[in-house]
A protein has these predicted regions:
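Conserved beta-loop-alpha segment that forms the PLP phosphate-binding cup at the N-terminus of a helix
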Residues: 1-3, 8-34, 43-46
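Substrate-binding/gating loop at the entrance of the active-site cleft, primarily
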Residues: 17-20, 38-55, 63-70
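Active-site phosphate-binding strand-loop segment of PLP-dependent enzymes
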Residues: 65-117
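Active-site PLP attachment segment
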Residues: 128-165
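PLP-dependent enzyme catalytic core of the Aspartate aminotransferase-like
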Residues: 247-285
């Protein structure tokens, strides 16, 4: 079910308890002393997973045109693995996947690792045609699968780098107790996506996301770079801290403080009515 939905090879596709455990299982098989490129202000569990290992860590600052920063650093020629969130949890920035495909052509030995927790379930994805060599994600976010489950996929290039068969990773992942009910929840969520036409659901989500991006920009509540980038996720950081957060919570709008702003997001089940309600509340003094 997972391999079919995500366009991955069944033998290279794994159910995991969550992203943090899965990513650590996978990178524990990597050769030591590899040069890893990470982003500053990246999802902490992704960063710590590599910092806990015997790797050489290199970081570049987070910036609106992050692709330029990545390209400049890779040009030095010493990076073995680029690891990043496909969608940034703290800003909603969506990495340009076409840019990553171009990187793979120019740096054929580069391994690209993606945290897909804020991506899978929110965008159509085919792993085998993507530039990624490892993608891991928890199921509780956009996959709507509840807690205790996740998915991980690896490429043939990743298998070549670890010089082990996929069974070695399988044995790591399934070592010890596994929550069968949580796995069933993940399967249920994926089957529900398929039943209701996932591509159609994503089209609905994309439409409301585009409307929200434009309207929130019109009232000056999101940074200008969000509109300037070719593609953005459905996660937005609204300007304003405690006051905005309290106002939204009071009006039954789910949100969370994030940095110097407030994070909101839209999924396929949100409607224009939801967006209009949000805008009405935000425009009130």
């Amino acid at each position: 079910v997972l391999a079919k939905f995500f366009g991955s090879t069944p033998a290279n596709t794994f159910v995991i308890p969550n992203f943090s455990i899965g990513i650590r299982n996978a990178i524990s098989l990597l050769p030591k002393k590899l040069n890893i490129l990470l982003l500053q202000e990246e999802y902490p569990s992704l960063v710590k997973a590599f910092e806990e290992g015997d790797f050489n860590i290199h970081k570049i600052p987070m910036q609106p045109e992050i692709e330029e920063g990545i390209e400049k650093r890779l040009a030095k020629g010493d990076i073995d693995i680029l690891a990043l969130s496909i969608v940034q949890y703290a800003s909603g920035l969506f990495i340009d996947i076409e840019f990553l495909k171009d990187l793979k052509e120019r740096y054929p030995n580069l391994i690209i690792v993606g945290d897909g927790t804020q991506f899978l379930g929110a965008h159509h994805f085919n792993f085998d045609t993507s530039p990624f060599d490892l993608v891991a994600a928890s199921g509780y976010k956009w996959l709507l699968a509840g807690f205790g489950n996740g998915v991980m996929m690896i490429s043939e290039a990743y298998i070549d780098m670890i010089q082990k068969k996929p069974l070695a990773l399988f044995n790591l992942v399934f070592n010890g107790h596994f929550n069968i009910l949580a796995i069933a929840s993940l399967r249920f969520a994926i089957k529900a996506f398929e039943k209701h036409d996932f591509k159609l659901l994503m089209k609905k989500k994309d439409n409301i996301t585009q409307n929200a991006k434009q309207l929130l920009n019109d009232i000056g509540l999101i940074d200008s770079w969000v509109l300037q980038r070719g593609q953005h996720s459905s996660i937005f950081i609204l300007k304003g801290e405690k006051g905005v957060h309290k106002k939204l919570i009071k009006n039954n709008i789910k949100c969370v403080p994030r940095g110097k702003g407030v994070r909101i997001s839209f999924h396929y089940y949100n409607t224009d009515k939801d967006l209009n309600h949000l805008l009405e509340i935000l425009k009130k003094d």
